[in-house]
Amino acid sequence: MERITVTLGERSYPITIAAGLFNEPASFLPLKSGDQVMLVTNETLAPLYLDKVRGVLQRAGVNVDSVILPDGERYKSLTVLDTVFTALLKKPHGRDTTLVALGGGVIGDLTGFAAASYQRGVRFIQVPTTLLSQVDSSVGGKTAVNHPLGKNMIGAFYQPASVVVDLDCLKTLPARELASGLAEVIKYGIILDADFFTWLEGNLDALLRLDGPAMAYCIRRCCELKAEVVAADEREAGLRALLNLGHTFGHAIEAEMGYGNWLHGEAVAAGMVMAACTSERLGQFSSADTQRIIALLRRAGLPVNGPREMSAQAYLPHMLRDKKVLAGELRLVLPLAIGKSEVRGGVSHEVVLSAIADCQQA
């Protein structure tokens, strides 16, 4: 069992990583006998895990209700959020309730925002079931729902009480979802840890076949890196923005193509290549390192080009709604070398559009 602490003073919390955690009531601390819980999951995961998690909590004396939501990025919306509020109010659940997010990034983000908003804030626990949510979205307290004009535009910073990562969940993960998660894994190597990127080049095949020790190390290292960044910059005033490598481009793809048509990790993968190409054009990133990124993404089964039906010009309106934009100026996370990156403003639209166009045609 691995345990990592996200250090935020009185709001610090543990990330527990191991196989078989759904069998142990102690995995779901700080829950205790007599507590009231609303388990939030989706219709795909409910048949796989709902009874198991509900059962282990009930054996610990926890009172459990549940709400099952439709599955997919398009349902990360205010309308579906209201479904959670309605379920909480009908019981009713008070301020002493705990929301448990049992699912991937959509469930985690939506449930976290529900917890931040319901009666001005209740406790919640992240139980991520996808690789992407285990290494990224469940850690750090970013919660949100989408708006038709932009991804994650309505949300709050709100930290969980704990994160429970059961490695056994990956056994039921479709190959496309596994690849999507690997995009965020690769991101950490590009922006923060050159040694980890090199390790990924040597161990990607083991991750693709769900080798236990390799996957445990991979998730632990990603969570360590994320925890360090969040502890230093919880509200994304500086360092934490680096975690958005590829996301400004990727969110544009998701919004333009329709939420769910491109998985988040797929869009981020293409976006990271666009960011690398932009940095190349500015003379601050090598072509050789761009090719290393492209090669690793391809081995993971991820796209390295944007959708052909989306013109370069179609990106800009979405990118200019990005949360990093200041005074109307586009700010991008750009790699400087494998393991090193920066947030840069003042990049001309012409340079960005040229990089996008080349990535569309490559």
UniProtKB/Swiss-Prot annotation:
Cofactor(s) this protein requires: Co(2+); Zn(2+); NAD(+)
Annotated EC: 4.2.3.4
Keyword terms: Amino-acid biosynthesis, Aromatic amino acid biosynthesis, Cobalt, Cytoplasm, Lyase, Metal-binding, NAD, Nucleotide-binding, Zinc
Keyword presence, NAD: yes
Binding site for Zn(2+): 184, 247, 264
Cellular compartments annotated: Cytoplasm
Family classification: Belongs to the sugar phosphate cyclases superfamily. Dehydroquinate synthase family.
Record's protein name: 3-dehydroquinate synthase
Pathway assigned in UniProt: Metabolic intermediate biosynthesis; chorismate biosynthesis; chorismate from D-erythrose 4-phosphate and phosphoenolpyruvate: step 2/7
Positions bound to NAD(+): 71-76, 105-109, 129-130, 142, 151, 169-172
Functional note: Catalyzes the conversion of 3-deoxy-D-arabino-heptulosonate 7-phosphate (DAHP) to dehydroquinate (DHQ).
Lineage: Bacteria, Pseudomonadati, Pseudomonadota, Gammaproteobacteria, Enterobacterales
Any one Gene Ontology cellular component term annotated for this protein: cytoplasm
The reaction(s) this protein catalyses: 7-phospho-2-dehydro-3-deoxy-D-arabino-heptonate = 3-dehydroquinate + phosphate
A biological process from GO: chorismate biosynthetic process
GO molecular function: 3-dehydroquinate synthase activity; metal ion binding; nucleotide binding
Cofactor remark: Binds 1 divalent metal cation per subunit. Can use either Co(2+) or Zn(2+).
